Amino acid sequence: MNEKYPIGEFQFDGEITNIIINEWINEIEDLPRLLKNTVIDLNNEQLDTSYRSGGWTVRQVIHHLADSHMNAYIRLKLAITEENPVIKPYDEKEWAELYDYNLPIEISLSLIEALHKRWCSLLRDLSPTDMERTFKHPESGSISIGKNIGIYAWHGKHHLAHITSLCKRKDW
């Protein structure tokens, strides 16, 4: 198994249908519960274990999910309210070294739970036309709301798999 990409990289070349979008939204909606159930019984030593050599700790992954998904939520709102806005990328590796990544995971678990409720509520209210709206990433180009939903459904599962595969390897 590839420890960096345990579920593979995001790939989707087909037509983004309402059925697929609803599946992706369900996956985004389920992440807070799945994440909490996976990490709730881990101790500090386990939380401060890297999921792979040179990779983030479990604690950093959890805080990263909060930061990344907050950015996704803001990008969604920008794409809904502006014409193909240029979004600001951030240096996730540098963010993972900031002090707040040492805080208890419960803070980010609560944030992720609340954020995903708002995010999924907004996503479920979008029309098929809204799904075609875009934002522009300076490196990746224009990305539709529909595709970005898929990217973030994958993103949550990707990082959850980092944690679950570590727990399995360590027999936690």
Swiss-Prot record:
NCBIfam families for this protein: PRK13291.1
Assigned keywords, A-Z: Cytoplasm, Hydrolase, Metal-binding, Zinc
Protein's name in the database: Putative metal-dependent hydrolase OB0782
Cofactor binding remark: Binds 1 zinc ion per subunit.
Gene3D superfamilies: dinb family like domain (1.20.120.450)
Complexes and interactors: Homodimer.
Keyword Hydrolase carried by entry: yes
Protein task: Possible metal-dependent hydrolase.
Organism: Oceanobacillus iheyensis (strain DSM 14371 / CIP 107618 / JCM 11309 / KCTC 3954 / HTE831)
Keyword Transcription listed: no
Residue positions binding Zn(2+): 64, 155, 159
Compartments in which it is found: Cytoplasm
EC number: 3.-.-.-
GO cellular component, one term: cytoplasm
One Pfam family hit: DinB_2
Cofactor(s) recorded in Swiss-Prot or TrEMBL: Zn(2+)
Family: Belongs to the metal hydrolase YfiT family.
Family matches, as InterPro entries: DinB-like, DinB/YfiT-like, Put_metal_dep_hydrolase_YfiT
MF-aspect GO terms: hydrolase activity; zinc ion binding
